[in-house]
C-alpha cells in the first residue's frame, strides 16, 4: 500500500508548479491588456481633446471674422485653421448683422432683393442670387468664392502634418459675377461626343467652370456657326446605319459608289456656288443662276426623263439626310449684318433729323387731328350750351319763313317729303357736316298727309262707337299692354354705360392739364368744374376720339377754356383776360404754334347764327 501511495503524492507535487505558472501567465496578459486599454484610452482622450481644441479655435476664429477691420494677413492666417463650412458660417452670420459677407469688406448691406433668380441682359443668362444676397457687390461675392475655394476640406485636427496652402486674394481690378448660373437647357450631343465621351466631359466641365467667370461687364460674344447632324433625334443611330450601308455598298460593287460620289460632288458644287451669293447684291443673281442652269443641262443631257426624275428624288433625299445644318451665324456674316444694321440706323437717324428739320409737318398733323376730334365732339347741344337755349329757333326762323312763302294750297295735300327739302336740309345741316351720324341724331321721315287723315278718321270712328256703346275693347288693347310691358327696358347704370366712362376719362385728362392754365385767371379747378362737366356732357364721344397725347390734351384744354371764359364772366379786355391771353401766347410759342392756330380750333365752335 505504501508503494502505491508514494508515486501519486509525487505527481501531485509536480502538478502544483504548472498551475502556478499558468496563473502567473494569465495575470501578466491581463495586466498587459489593461495597460494597452488604458494607453488607448489616454490616446483617444488626447485625440478628442485635440479635436475639441481645434474646433474651439475654429469657432473663435469665426467669431473674430464677424468683427470689422479685418486685415488680409489675418484672413489668410485664419484660412489654415478653418474649413469651408466654418467660412460659410462667417458669411451667414455677417449677412444677419447686415454686414457684407466678405470679411475684408466693411460696407453694410442695403436693400436685399426678395427674388431668387436674376436675368442678366448683358450675358443673356439666368443666375441664382441666393448666395449673392449676402454681399454688397459682385466683386465681394467673387472674391469670397475665390478665397473659399482655396480653404482645405480636410479636418482641422489632421492638418499638422500637411503642408499649409498659400492663400491668394482676388484683386479689386478683377470684375465679379452676378451669381451661380442656372443651366436652363443641356447642350446638343454631336457624333464626335459619342466617339470620345471623355472629350465631351472635359468640355462640359470647362463650360460649367466658365460660368463662374462671367462678369457683370461681359462684352457681347461673337456668333459662331457649327455643323451638326441634320436629323438630331436619330444622331445616335448614324454610325450603325453608315456601317450597314458600307457593307451593302461593298456587295453592290464599285459602280454604285461612283454614282453616289458623283451626286455628292454635284451637291457640294451647288452649295459652294450658292454660298457665293449675297442677300444685298442683285448683280450676282445672274451669275448664281448660270451655274445652276449648267448643272441642270448636264444632268438632262446625260440621262433620260425617268432617270432625271429618279435623280431629283435622290437629290431631295440626300438634302433631307444631309449632315450639314447651320446653327447660329458665322463671324463673317455677323459682320455683314452689323454693317446692314448700321446702315438702317443711319437711315432712321436721317429720317428723325428730317423730322426735326421740318416741324411744320408735325404741326400740320397735330392741328388736323385736333380739328377732326373737335368736329366729332361738337353737337347741337354743345352750341345750345355755349350760346343759349334759343340757338336752334333763331337759326331756323328765316329758312322756315322762306319755305312758307313758297307753299300753295295744293302742296298741303301732296306728300310733304317732296316739298320740304330746304327745311329738312336746314335741320340736318349740322349732322351732315359731321364725319358720321349717330343713331340718336338721325331724324325719322315725316308721315304722309293721307296716312294721317286715315288715322284721324279711325280714331273718330272709335270714339263714336265707344259713346254709342257698340265699341268693344278687343284683343288690341291687351296686346298693346303686353307689348308695353314687354318693351319696357331699364337704362344703363353709370358703371356700365360706355358714354359715361368716356366722359369720365375726358374729365380726368382735362383735370390734369387745367390747373396750370388757371393760374393767370386766379381761379381754381373747382370754380369751373361744373361748367366743364356740363360742356363735356354735350360732346359726342367715341372710343377713338378720346385717345390723345399730353400736348394734344393741353391744346384741347386751352380751346375749351377760351370757350368757357365768357360763361364764367371773364371779359377779353379785362386785366385777367389780358394776362390769360399773354399766358396762352407764351405757351403756344413753347409748343411751336401761333395764336392763329388756336383760333382755327376755337372757330369750330363759333357760329354766325347768334340769338337776337
UniProtKB/Swiss-Prot annotation:
Compositional bias annotation for Low complexity: 206-218
Record's keyword annotation contains Transport: no
Biased composition (Polar residues): 295-305
Cellular compartment(s): Cytoplasm; Nucleus
Residues with PTM N-acetylalanine: 2
Annotated region described as Disordered, given as residue ranges: 1-38, 193-267, 295-317
Reactions catalysed according to its record: O-phospho-L-seryl-[protein] + H2O = L-seryl-[protein] + phosphate; O-phospho-L-threonyl-[protein] + H2O = L-threonyl-[protein] + phosphate
Annotated Basic residues bias: 246-258
Positions where Phosphoserine occurs in the chain: 9, 216, 433, 480
Result when mutating residue 105 to A: Abolishes interaction with RNA polymerase II complex subunits
InterPro entries: Rtr1/RPAP2, Rtr1/RPAP2_dom, Rtr1/RPAP2_sf
Domain of life of the native organism: Eukaryota
E.C. designation(s): 3.1.3.16
A GO CC annotation given for this chain: nucleus
Molecular-function GO terms, alphabetical: protein serine/threonine phosphatase activity; RNA polymerase core enzyme binding; RNA polymerase II CTD heptapeptide repeat phosphatase activity; zinc ion binding
Domain notes: The RTR1-type zinc finger mediates interactions with RNA polymerase II complex subunits.
Free-text function comment from the UniProt entry: Protein phosphatase that displays CTD phosphatase activity and regulates transcription of snRNA genes. Recognizes and binds phosphorylated 'Ser-7' of the C-terminal heptapeptide repeat domain (CTD) of the largest RNA polymerase II subunit POLR2A, and mediates dephosphorylation of 'Ser-5' of the CTD, thereby promoting transcription of snRNA genes. Downstream of EIF2AK3/PERK, dephosphorylates ERN1, a sensor for the endoplasmic reticulum unfolded protein response (UPR), to abort failed ER-stress adaptation and trigger apoptosis.
Description of how the protein assembles with itself and partners: Associates with the RNA polymerase II complex. Interacts with transcribing RNA polymerase II phosphorylated on 'Ser-7' on CTD.
Name of the protein: Putative RNA polymerase II subunit B1 CTD phosphatase RPAP2
Lineage: Eukaryota, Metazoa, Chordata, Craniata, Vertebrata
